[in-house]
Regions:
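A short beta-strand motif that forms the metal-chelation/ATP-contact edge
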Residues: 90, 212-214, 221, 271-285
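Conserved N-proximal alpha/beta basic substrate-recognition cap immediately N-terminal to
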Residues: 42-144
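Short N-terminal or domain-adjacent regulatory/targeting segments
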Residues: 2-5, 9-31
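Protein kinase-like catalytic core scaffold
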Residues: 164, 198, 220-221, 261, ...
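A long amphipathic alpha-helix within ATP-dependent nucleotide-binding catalytic cores
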Residues: 229-274, 278, 286, 292-322, ...
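Extreme N-terminal starter segment of soluble prokaryotic enzymes
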Residues: 33-38
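Rossmann-like NAD(P)H-binding beta-loop-alpha module
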Residues: 143-162
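Phosphate-binding site of ATP-dependent enzymes
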Residues: 175-256
Length: 331
């Protein structure tokens, strides 16, 4: 697409050092026939490890990868349209909620190109109000949630429901998340009023959440300090994944239709509760995360290509007559 940058182009982010042992471990999928990919990277993530590390791994394995930066690119949408030879096998997106990247991803999907994650799954996860209802309707343990178009409406929540956690409906990376202990405290908060808000009952915790990361077909559990307890003495580390946590993470993936995702969970007296669902998180502390993600990207491309081939094979054959129709002369 116009002004996209090849993976071999200069980047201000440090290039991922390729781990030969990891290439051997994941090479069965990574070292396949070359794929053509376009990563859409929002400005906030241009200098982050992810998704640049995935780009580096794919490029080192012989795949062609372009990086499209919406913050500085005029995208020619007509280049997305089908031709005899598709320009890309897939578009991959790491986006912010209010960024332009998702519109470009949806445009690619409208042209029939594979998107990772599926553009509909990203929409579900990005709108936190929709995500809460989707999860609850599917039986995923999720806190009761209130939606308000502005903060002054939150005073309609009964005082008995406090303390609350208040956060933006389109938030990400746990930014602008507040614990509110009383209606009076709510009135004193300097809340960004540019978008809608969610409120949920505060779930007591020991100062940390557990992030469950799914880079493909595996689940990793990482202890992370809670944004509601910034001063807590927490050792951030990988912990064993119990059958309950693995089942919960995979259930979320199925319900939302995500291939690459993470969820924030907290343990309560009634069991684990999901606090948030994120498409393409940072995958911090996941071993060989970039290689696992690269493998998943290529597997999704294969899966979608096979599904399209099966659909074509199952489609009824339309036979057209080659005979010249006979036109009767009018009397």
């Amino acid at each position: 697409m116009a002004n996209s940058t090849s993976s071999s182009g200069a980047r201000s982010r440090a290039t991922q050092q390729i781990d030969i042992s990891a290439i051997r471990e994941f090479g069965e999928v990574l070292l396949t026939s070359p794929a053509r990919l376009c990563f859409i990277v929002e400005e906030r993530y241009e200098n982050d490890v992810m998704p640049g590390a995935v780009v580096d791994v794919l490029s080192s394995c012989g795949h062609h990868v372009d990086v499209l930066r919406p913050s500085g690119t005029v995208a020619d949408l007509w280049e997305l349209l089908p031709t005899d030879v598709a320009r890309y096998d897939a578009f991959v997106l790491k986006t912010v909620s209010s960024g332009p990247g998702l519109s470009l991803l949806e445009a690619a999907a409208a042209a029939g190109v594979t998107t990772i994650n599926d553009h509909r799954a990203i929409r579900l996860a990005r709108d936190k109000a929709v995500a809460a209802v989707r999860a609850r309707a599917a039986g995923i343990p999720f806190p009761k949630t209130w939606f308000a178009s502005k903060s002054t409406l939150l005073d309609q929540i009964p005082p008995a429901r406090y303390p609350l956690v208040v956060k933006p409906n389109d938030g990400s990376a746990m930014r602008d998340v507040y614990r509110v202990d009383s209606p009076g405290e709510l009135a004193q908060l300097d809340i960004d009023e540019s978008g809608s808000l969610l409120a949920q009952p505060y779930m007591p915790n020991p100062g940390y959440d557990v992030k469950l990361y799914n880079p493909g077909d595996e689940v990793f559990a990482i202890v992370k300090r809670s944004p509601l307890h910034p001063g807590a003495d927490v050792v951030e580390e990988q912990i064993p994944v119990t059958p309950e946590l693995r089942s919960l993470a995979r259930a979320v993936g199925r319900v939302f239709g995500l291939d690459i995702y993470g969820i924030d969970v907290v343990e309560t007296a009634d069991g684990w509760v999901v606090l948030d669902v994120n498409d393409f998180p940072s995958f911090g502390m996941v071993p060989h995360a970039a290689y696992r993600l690269a493998r998943t990207v290529l597997r999704v491309i294969r899966r979608q290509a096979a599904a399209r081939a099966d659909a074509r094979a199952a489609a009824p054959t339309v036979y057209r007559s080659t005979r010249t129709p006979v036109v009767e002369a009018k009397a």
